[in-house]
């Protein structure tokens, strides 16, 4: 039986990119859910015109937007089998979604991460602070949890039932690392697949600003050390 797949895209002022993202998503997806995270541009209009379901979340934060999308799904009569998370800036290649969900469909993995560290990334697409942050976080996860993750990339797929069991809570920059740490902690089956990555449209709201970079770094380290301490008891 064909699995039901829904995509959640948090978006803040991505009017120039969001339409491209939605239109490039493969037709194996049942529904594309864009969470307009307080945008002041035409993100909502562009997303609706491209055929997405658009929700509005006034509280700023990547986690807030993701949780809004999950709350919407929780209230649907028919729940999906797989949830895919994807950024709205067109840095990921939405066409790679078929590659990301395949290990869940064919090999019964619970979680699949699209890794940007496999040499498929466009030159300059990942900023130095992103590269260093990824390296540090994945090294720490390997040290504390024997993890094989190589990236914290936002392009990922997860079984809906698995996602519910994770009981996600981070509201801002720590959403991605929280998910990966809980996958490790609860011993779900996971794998990575290489994905392409290009220079985004517009300026990054996280790594493109000093404030965003600092707060993201603090969040990531906080989650890692929080779970490393828990693992000792």
Protein language model regions, located:
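Donor nucleotide-sugar binding loop of glycosyltransferases
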Residues: 14-17, 39, 93
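Hydrophobic helical membrane-anchoring modules
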Residues: 1-4, 16, 146, 168-233
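Acidic donor-diphosphate engagement hotspot in glycosyltransferases and nucleotidyltransferases
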Residues: 43, 95-99, 179
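Short, well-formed alpha-helical segments that are part of the catalytic scaffolds
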Residues: 12-27
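A conserved acidic beta->alpha catalytic loop
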Residues: 36-45
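Short beta-strand-to-loop acidic/aromatic patch adjacent to the donor-nucleotide binding site
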Residues: 77-91
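Acceptor/aglycone-binding surface of glycosyltransferases and processive sugar-polymer synthases
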Residues: 58-60, 64-72, 94-173, 200-211, ...
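Short loop->beta transition adjacent to catalytic acidic/histidine clusters or analogous donor-positioning motifs
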Residues: 2-5, 24-33, 53, 81
């Amino acid at each position: 039986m064909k699995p039901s797949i829904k995509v959640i895209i948090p978006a803040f002022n991505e009017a120039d990119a969001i339409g491209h993202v939605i239109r490039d998503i493969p037709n194996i997806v049942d529904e594309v859910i864009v969470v307009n995270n307080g945008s002041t541009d035409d993100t909502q209009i562009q997303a609706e015109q491209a055929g997405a379901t658009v929700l509005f979340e006034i509280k700023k934060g990547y986690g807030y937007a993701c949780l809004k999308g999950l709350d919407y799904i929780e209230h649907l009569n028919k729940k999906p089998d797989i949830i895919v998370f994807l950024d709205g800036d067109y840095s990921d290649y939405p066409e790679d979604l078929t590659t990301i969900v395949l290990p869940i469909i064919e090999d019964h993995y619970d979680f699949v991460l699209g890794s940007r560290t496999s040499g498929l990334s466009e030159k300059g697409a990942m900023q130095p602070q992103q590269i260093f942050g990824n390296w540090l976080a994945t090294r720490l996860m390997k040290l504390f949890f024997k993890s094989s993750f190589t990236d914290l990339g936002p392009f990922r797929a997860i079984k809906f039932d698995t996602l519910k069991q994770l009981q996600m809570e981070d509201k801002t920059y720590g959403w991605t690392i929280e998910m990966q740490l809980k996958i490790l902690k609860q011993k779900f089956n996971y794998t990575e697949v290489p994905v392409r990555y290009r220079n985004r449209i517009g300026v990054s709201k996280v790594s493109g600003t000093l404030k965003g970079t600092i707060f993201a770094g603090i969040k990531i380290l906080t989650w890692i050390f929080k779970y490393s301490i828990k693992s000792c008891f």
